[in-house]
């Protein structure tokens, strides 16, 4: 059964555009060897990290969404762990959206606005 996955990884900020494309193509080809479906790659570009990672304060973010059996996750993460260009990665299994409507929608009661009395100016 195919599951949906989302992987975000961060590359070293010192990589050139050509090197970034080589890294992206390397991992894209890696996933294609595992016959994943609906592979989408988005390069977010260089962004500031929330905290320093391996002494880097910036990183090049890349997002990959795909559908696969699940046997590709561990080898892909191992390849990224061994790479010097990848400073952080994370893979998430994305839950599919449920298209069913609820059986009954409870009625929501909205309280009526309460009018507050206007203050009377104090006489001196």
UniProtKB/Swiss-Prot annotation:
It comes from the Bacteria. Gene3D superfamilies: 3.30.70.60. One of its GO terms (molecular function) is small ribosomal subunit rRNA binding. Binds together with bS18 to 16S ribosomal RNA. Belongs to the bacterial ribosomal protein bS6 family. NCBIfam families: S6. This is Small ribosomal subunit protein bS6.
């Amino acid at each position: 059964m195919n599951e949906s996955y989302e992987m975000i990884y961060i590359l070293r900020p010192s990589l050139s555009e050509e090197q970034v494309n080589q890294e992206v193509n390397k991992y894209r080809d890696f996933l294609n060897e595992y016959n994943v479906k609906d592979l989408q790659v988005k390069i977010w570009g260089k962004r500031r990290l929330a905290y320093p990672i391996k002494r880097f304060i910036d990183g090049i973010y890349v997002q990959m969404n795909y559908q696969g059996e699940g046997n590709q996750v561990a080898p892909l993460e191992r390849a990224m762990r061994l790479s010097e260009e990848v400073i952080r990665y994370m893979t998430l299994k994305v839950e599919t959206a449920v298209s069913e409507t609820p059986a009954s929608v409870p009625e929501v009661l909205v309280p009526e606005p309460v009018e507050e009395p206007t203050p009377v100016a104090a006489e001196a």
